[in-house]
Regions:
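Blade-level signature of beta-propeller repeat domains, shared across WD40, Kelch, NHL, RCC1
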Residues: 324, 367-394
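Conserved beta-propeller blade signature
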Residues: 65-68, 127-130, 190-193, 252-255, ...
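Sequence/structural signature of beta-propeller modules
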Residues: 1-36, 394
Length: 394
């Protein structure tokens, strides 16, 4: 549905601007998190119904289960089935001894069932993968957890479950080391990890089967031992500054390069080290890196710290985090293409949290961090509002 807008124009803003709604105009189908839809957001004590800055969520199938990275509470929350009402309490917890405690690694040392700033999460084979960012590792469950504090089966980035040093304590990085791995994705047997602090994406050609297994190839760096932002040079078609979310759009790899304020899109799935992408969205060329293309206000072709990316129906959707909105593109994409779709703001030139810096409602967003999809449901980690939204597509 195309909606003509009549707005008070900001500088260089068209008086009439149109866009397509990416998600249902009725707002979120389900809101998870304790506050009501009109309440002010405050940090929340841990419980089965509260979250603090969630950054990722995965609905495994339309009927569930649902797993959420409750990032600020250093835990995963699990629902056995797709939640059916707002504020529905979680059934399972991983990372803390109970629903009412918090702390990195449960205020202890790293274990196979503890977490420190969990961020990325995805279904992985028959199980689950989680970017356990501040433990500098990725945890893999070979089967979906079905109980509290189920331990992971495999760890990547560390030699075992009991260490958590950056790059295993070394100055340089390597194929088996990590620094703040924020994003994870599994596609056609391959595991992709946004090794954010090392400014790269690591790829395993098959699902790893042993602890500390090295990646097969790297994107964003010339080789496995480099870790400089943008490969030590200016932004390019191959370099990254702060890679985060990952998705597949029409069989093409997409990486949300938040630090360069862009989405990188490859021609197909790259299979070799440092393969350059085909084009970017959010910048007019490969060399651009400024947020909102150097402007204070966003536009329909600019981004500001896009941390998340997902695909649903016909849409490629970016969680344009610092602009507190979702923006979407459809077919025939090219360098710097203008977005057609918008959710979370009234027009493309607005970036206010919850539309007007006020309280949240079913249609508003505040620093949406992670985004994923399952059939016709888009799952948004609305981090600034301490909640997760299950939102139906158009």
């Amino acid at each position: 549905m195309e909606i003509p807008l009549k707005i008070n124009p900001l500088p260089n803003t068209p008086i009439d601007e149109s866009f397509l709604n990416i998600l249902s105009l009725e707002g979120s189908d389900i809101i998870l998190g304790e506050q009501t839809s009109e309440s002010l957001v405050i940090p929340l004590e841990p419980s089965p119904t509260t979250m603090f800055g969630p950054r990722g969520a995965c609905l495994v199938s339309e009927t569930g289960p649902l797993w959420v990275c409750d990032t600020g509470h250093h835990r995963l929350l699990g629902w056995k089935h797709r939640p059916e009402r707002d504020g529905q309490p979680a059934d399972w917890i991983i990372g803390q001894p109970n629903f009412y405690q918090e702390g990195q690694n449960a205020k202890g040392t790293p274990q196979a069932n503890t977490l420190s700033v969990p961020t990325g999460i995805c279904a992985c084979g028959e199980g689950l993968a989680v970017g356990d960012a501040w433990n500098h590792r990725v945890l893999i469950w070979q089967k979906l957890p079905q109980d509290n504090n189920t331990p992971a089966d495999i760890v990547l980035g560390q030699a075992d479950f009991h260490h958590n040093q950056v790059n295993r304590g070394e100055t340089d990085t390597a194929a088996e080391r990590m620094h703040w791995p924020y994003g994870v994705m599994y596609y056609q047997g391959k595991l992709f990890v946004a090794d954010t602090g090392n400014r790269r994406v690591l790829v395993w050609n098959q699902l790893p089967t042993c602890n500390g297994q090295p990646a097969d190839y790297v994107l964003g760096q010339p080789d496995m031992n480099r870790r400089d932002e943008n490969g030590g040079d200016s932004p390019s078609a191959a370099s990254m500054r702060w890679p985060h979310g990952l998705a597949i759009w029409q069989n093409n790899l997409v990486v949300a390069d938040a630090g360069n304020n862009r989405l990188m899109i490859w021609d197909g799935i790259p299979t070799k080290n440092n393969t350059p992408c085909q084009f970017v969205l959010g910048q007019e060329n490969f060399e651009g890196a400024e947020l909102n293309r150097g402007g204070y206000f966003p536009t329909s072709n600019a981004l500001s710290m896009p941390y998340g990316v997902a695909v649903t129906n016909q849409w490629l959707i970016a969680a344009d985090t610092a602009n507190s909105r979702l923006v979407g593109w459809k077919n025939n994409l090219s360098m710097g293409a203008t977005a057609e779709g918008l959710t979370g703001q009234s027009h493309f030139r607005s970036k206010s949290e919850n539309r007007s810096y006020g309280s949240c409602d079913r249609n508003s967003l505040s620093w949406p961090y992670g985004i994923s999809s399952c059939d016709n449901t888009v799952i948004v980690a609305d981090s600034g509002n301490n909640r997760v939204l299950l939102w139906l597509g158009k």
